[in-house]
Amino acid sequence: MKFISLVFVSFLLNYSASAQKKEYAAPDAHAARLGALISLNVATIADTLTRPFEDNAQKARAIYYWMTHNISFDLKATKGNDNKNIKPEIVVNTRKATPLGYATLFQEMSSMANIRCLTVDGYVKRSTSDINNIADEINHSWVVVQLGKTPTEWYYIDPANGAGYTDEAIKNFTPDFTSEYFFANKTLFDLSHFPDNMAWQLGGTKGPQTKKDFFGLPVFCNSAFTTGVGNIKPLTGYIKAKTKTPVFFSFNTSTDSTISSIALIAGDDRHPSAPVPMNFTNNGGIISFSYQFKREDSFPLRIVVDGKVVMEYMIEITE
């Protein structure tokens, strides 16, 4: 019975991911057709994007698609935690933003479309150097939107992460549209984002309850959302193990397609090892594998699923 339940849950997650793509095909196509909308002000852009749609979710999606394809990530300002140019008109004119700039513009456009939207400030981990290294200052922002009147009808949207990702040093930005940061999975979002105000942790008590708990978790990359990982083990970001003892990993997945490869990469961006292919099992959507590390060392460890880094750990191996 337990196996059947897991298969059913996996089916529902797969169906949900597929349904989302179909549901937002129209606003995505509309925003893509409009292009950059150069020389238009914020109000005109918001109206042009949302006018064809009556449903607030589709309006919000059109805004999300347009922003993630037409606003670039401001690396210098983000690295310096400089948020002086976050006003919506400045972001639209310069076509670049910090995470708070993305969130502020999204909130402004949503309000113009009569969608209730609030900006949430908080924390993310961008690399394994952040694990167990509690940040003193807020380093990220996202939004929550309300489509109904109940607490369960608030949804996460992260337009900055949806546009792409940076390297560890925040020197390079890779555009990489991630659909799944729109109405993001609340459980996974709570593992990868920590709000400054706990009232905006929408997944409830399943997520980390303190900053210390949050910074003790693994790093979850954009591909964790596209893969739909859940029930991750181990859920501690810093792993200690012996050379003679295998380390076991497992997670659920909600991807539509079958996973064909899993690999481990040791080392940071500057000195990564060659990917080490894993023998893994897929039992009703539960991916499991293990690896025995052969020498004493401490290093970042990346889990790569079908060629994309999904999550990262720090690992310490002793004899």
Q: Where would I find each of the regions flagged by the language model?
A:
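Secondary-structure boundary elements
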Residues: 21-98, 104-107
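Hydrophobic/aromatic-rich core segments of domains that either
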Residues: 104-184
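Alpha-helical and coiled-coil interaction segments, frequently adjacent to or embedded
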Residues: 136, 155-157, 166-319
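Residues embedded in well-ordered secondary-structure elements
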Residues: 6-8, 52, 132-134, 238-240, ...
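Bacterial Sec-dependent N-terminal signal peptides
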Residues: 1-22
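Juxtamembrane/interface motifs at transmembrane-helix termini
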Residues: 6, 81-82, 298
